[in-house]
């Protein structure tokens, strides 16, 4: 298993002028942007392991068995997914719910305790699949993932102009918006790329800070993130913006 920093997309308002010039007519694979936690699921010599986006390990035995069965015959690989917890989860504000669950699961794993998660409530929205030692474009990676019958996010092929309309619809339904990726693009580990785009079309709101979450790792004994609440009672977790 080879650890790596994930590829990151850019917010629409951070795109360079060159990308914006052709955005409306460029075709993208468009999916719902869920508000959850990105996780890695790796297969190494037949062993299935679960990791946070910064490579802290936890475990879900029943889900591991399902994935092991699905990936029978595959080489070593990495599944990248947005993890949510609870029926109909994944809407704006749901990230805080799953974050706490993953933290507890990580602590239990380090202590050798059983998995603390109700695995029936775990939702894995798989959006990428990388076979070790390969360099395939997005379309090719999705074809490979479908061969193993992995539960992928639903995608639709549409122009950037139509994706903006679609993202507004998703925002009205309570989601963050839409994720766009150029079908022929290649995965660049550790890079923030112009061909993976976050469309977050939602109204602005005044938020009140109701608490803080402690940092971990190099941020132990520091503020890790702020808990903010809007006028409807929805809670979101955001980075503090504080430097080291």
Spans of features found by a protein language model:
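Short, motif-level signal for alpha-helix interfacial/capping segments enriched in acidic residues
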Residues: 12-18, 103-110, 158-164
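Short acidic/polar capping segments at secondary-structure boundaries
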Residues: 130-132, 184-185, 214-215
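Short helix-to-loop capping/linker segments positioned immediately adjacent to catalytic or ligand/cofactor-binding
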Residues: 113-116, 133, 154-170, 215-217
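Classical nucleotidyltransferase
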Residues: 31, 37-81, 187-244
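Charged, flexible boundary elements
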Residues: 1-25, 30
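A generic structural signal for well-ordered coil/turn residues at beta-strand boundaries
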Residues: 120-123, 174, 203, 222
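Amphipathic alpha-helical
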Residues: 1, 155-203
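Covalent nucleotidyltransferase
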Residues: 20-151
């Amino acid at each position: 298993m080879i650890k790596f920093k994930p590829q990151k997309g850019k917010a629409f308002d951070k795109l360079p002028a060159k990308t914006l010039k052709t955005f409306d007519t460029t075709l993208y694979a468009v999916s719902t942007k869920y508000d959850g936690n990105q996780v890695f699921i790796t297969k190494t010599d037949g062993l299935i392991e679960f990791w946070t986006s910064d490579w802290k390990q936890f475990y879900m035995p029943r889900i591991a068995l399902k994935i092991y069965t699905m990936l029978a015959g595959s080489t070593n690989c990495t599944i990248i997914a947005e993890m949510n917890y609870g029926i109909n989860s994944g809407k704006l504000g749901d990230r805080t719910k799953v974050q706490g669950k993953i933290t507890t699961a990580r602590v239990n794993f380090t202590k050798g305790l059983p998995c603390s998660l109700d695995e029936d409530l775990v939702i894995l929205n798989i959006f990428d699949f990388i076979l070790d030692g390969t360099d395939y474009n997005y379309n090719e990676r999705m074809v490979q993932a479908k061969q193993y019958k992995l539960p992928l996010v639903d995608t639709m092929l549409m122009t950037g102009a139509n994706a903006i309309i679609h993202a507004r619809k998703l925002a009205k339904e309570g989601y963050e918006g839409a994720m766009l990726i150029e079908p022929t693009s290649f995965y660049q580990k550790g890079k923030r790329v112009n061909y993976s785009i976050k469309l977050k079309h939602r109204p602005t709101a005044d938020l009140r800070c109701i608490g803080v979450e402690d940092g971990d790792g190099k941020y132990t004994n520091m503020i890790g993130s702020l808990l903010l609440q809007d006028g409807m009672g929805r809670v979101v977790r955001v980075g503090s913006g504080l430097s080291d």
